[in-house]
């Protein structure tokens, strides 16, 4: 697709200050038109040179010079498979023989970074014997994740151990197994993901959770949208299993039920307008769900078994806008911050003849937008959905958030994040649940639960060193959190914390991978024990 204004640039206007004193003759007009027509290819060539060749270079976690200087770095490279060049080539949105398009080049770089296996992506141009060549270089991140994670908050400790390979045999496919232990349950999770099977746009993603109180399996298979210019997509989503649903009130478990579910959704989408400058997408969906809630021990809640079907239609509009930052969520790598304006409106229809006691209509809206302020940005998001039955409002949910990030000088970032949410009439287990890494960071799991909630955080980060010993980033942070959740029949429950933290990140790994050790002072509601605590876990990503 030609860049905006391309045609206009082919037709030069009169020189500045010139004046036409007499009407031109027909012969003069013909000569001018002929000259413009002959000049058009030259102008187009100057404005959009033709790409003669594309060179793809993939590099290991450590460059050859680094591996030669440090034997351990050489061993690390030898233990893994470098990403295959064809994995990079299949993501390219430009081709040899076509005009160079800077917008498509930028989108290609974003898509490559979004795969999550590279620590650095660069796309540049060069001239070889006078011809334009595009050089694509990727540097792998350490994608074999030996997970030995722990999180401690106020005397509560959770941990997980496992192995996940996000670049299996250099193909950008994912395999892994993780065991986790938290206060609610233990679980073994198996995961597999095949991107672009057989060189196509197709996707297969499966996961299985074997829990101490149930088991759940899920999958996604289809052909997703992978670029702004893609015209078609289709996917089939499924979830089958049984799981224990826990409900909490004032930080204490109040109820427990077992949910048995079989859910299947087929969705297809078409984009009547699609290109690097945005898209309009139309989609249709159909779903079938069998859901049952049964008592789990004494005091359980019973919800009747239901087999139901529904149909949905949606329209989505997007105008893309991105900014690239460093030292925002992680060390020594570029991060794509999505500031696009996107609006999606969906309407679900649930006829009474498909298992519902009454017919219902469920409108949904999602909207988000952002604006770059130099190296800073402001971003907002709103989501709302409701289900109207023939005689009443059955359920509803609304959530909004605002993030302001200020990066005044290199290696430092100040972030203000605010969000609020309200829910009504949703099934058990759908309550707002804050604590232990979600919401105020120095509080235990389920410290704040309810159908209404709000929280915010103000944090300043200093990424002091990117690569100590060539592999570790070290930084410091100060933070203030405040917020909570509560039910409609109780007063607001709000608590907060203020503290300092140490940030440690593996700069040669894929992803941001920043861990935290925080010392915090707690105030307000929702805490027990000592006001001063030490918490260990992952850094929040905004």
Residue ranges and their predicted role:
Residues 161, 187-192, 216-222, 234-237, ...:
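Outer-membrane beta-barrel translocator domains and adjoining extracellular loop/strand segments
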Residues 159-168, 186-199, 217-229, 234-236, ...:
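Feature captures outer-membrane beta-barrel proteins of Gram-negative bacteria and organelles
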Residues 50, 132, 142-144, 157, ...:
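Outer-envelope beta-barrel architecture signal
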Residues 2, 6-11, 45-165, 176-180, ...:
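Periplasmic polypeptide-binding modules associated with outer-membrane biogenesis and secretion
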């Amino acid at each position: 697709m030609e860049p905006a204004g391309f045609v206009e640039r082919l037709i030069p206007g009169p020189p500045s200050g010139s004046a036409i004193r007499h009407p031109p003759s027909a012969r003069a007009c013909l000569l001018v038109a002929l000259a413009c027509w002959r000049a058009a290819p030259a102008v187009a060539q100057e404005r959009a040179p033709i790409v003669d060749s594309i060179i793809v270079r993939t590099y290991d976690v450590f460059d050859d010079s680094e591996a030669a200087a440090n034997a351990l770095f050489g061993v690390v490279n030898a233990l893994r498979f470098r990403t295959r060049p064809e994995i990079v080539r299949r993501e390219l949105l430009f081709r040899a023989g076509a005009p160079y398009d800077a917008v498509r080049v930028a989108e290609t770089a974003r898509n490559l970074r979004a795969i999550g296996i590279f620590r650095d992506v660069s796309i540049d141009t060069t001239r070889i014997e006078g011809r334009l060549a595009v050089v694509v270089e990727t540097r792998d991140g350490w994608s074999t994740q030996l997970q030995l994670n722990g999180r401690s908050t106020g005397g509560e400790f959770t941990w997980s151990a496992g192995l996940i390979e996000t670049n299996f045999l250099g193909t950008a496919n994912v395999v892994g197994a993780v065991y986790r232990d938290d206060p609610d349950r233990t679980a073994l999770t198996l995961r597999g993901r095949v991107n672009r099977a057989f060189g196509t746009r197709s996707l297969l993603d499966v996961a299985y959770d074997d829990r101490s109180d149930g088991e759940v399996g899920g999958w996604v298979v289809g052909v997703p949208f992978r670029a702004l210019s893609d015209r078609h997509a289709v996917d089939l989503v499924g979830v089958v299993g049984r799981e224990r649903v826990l409900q909490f009130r004032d930080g204490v478990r109040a109820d427990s039920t077992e949910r048995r579910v079989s859910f299947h959704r087929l969705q297809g989408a078409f984009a009547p307008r699609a290109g690097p400058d945005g898209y309009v997408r139309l989609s249709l969906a159909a779903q079938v769900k069998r859901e049952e809630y049964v008592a789990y021990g004494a005091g359980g809640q019973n919800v009747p078994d239901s087999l139901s079907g529904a149909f949905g239609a949606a329209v989505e509009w997007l105008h893309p806008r991105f900014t690239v930052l460093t030292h925002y969520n992680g060390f020594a790598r570029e991060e794509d911050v999505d500031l696009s304006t996107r609006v999606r409106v969906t309407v679900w229809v649930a006829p009474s003849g498909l298992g519902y006691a009454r017919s219902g209509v469920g409108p949904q809206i999602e909207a988000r937008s952002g604006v770059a302020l130099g190296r800073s940005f402001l971003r907002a998001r709103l989501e709302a959905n409701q289900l109207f039955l023939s005689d009443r409002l059955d359920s509803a949910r609304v959530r909004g958030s605002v993030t302001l990030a200020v990066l005044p000088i290199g290696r430092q970032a100040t972030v203000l994040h605010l969000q609020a949410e309200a829910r009504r009439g949703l099934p058990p287990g759908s309550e707002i649940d804050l604590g232990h890494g979600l919401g105020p960071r120095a509080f235990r799991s389920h410290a704040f639960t309810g159908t209404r909630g709000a929280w915010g955080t103000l944090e300043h980060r200093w990424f002091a060193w990117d690569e100590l010993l060539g592999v570790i980033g070290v930084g410091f942070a100060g933070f203030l959190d405040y917020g909570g959740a509560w039910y409609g029949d109780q007063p607001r429950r709000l608590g907060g914390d203020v503290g300092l933290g140490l940030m440690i990140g593996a700069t040669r790994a894929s992803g941001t991978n920043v861990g935290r050790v925080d010392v915090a002072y707690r105030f307000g509601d929702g805490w027990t024990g000592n006001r001063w605590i030490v918490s260990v876990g992952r850094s929040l990503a905004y």
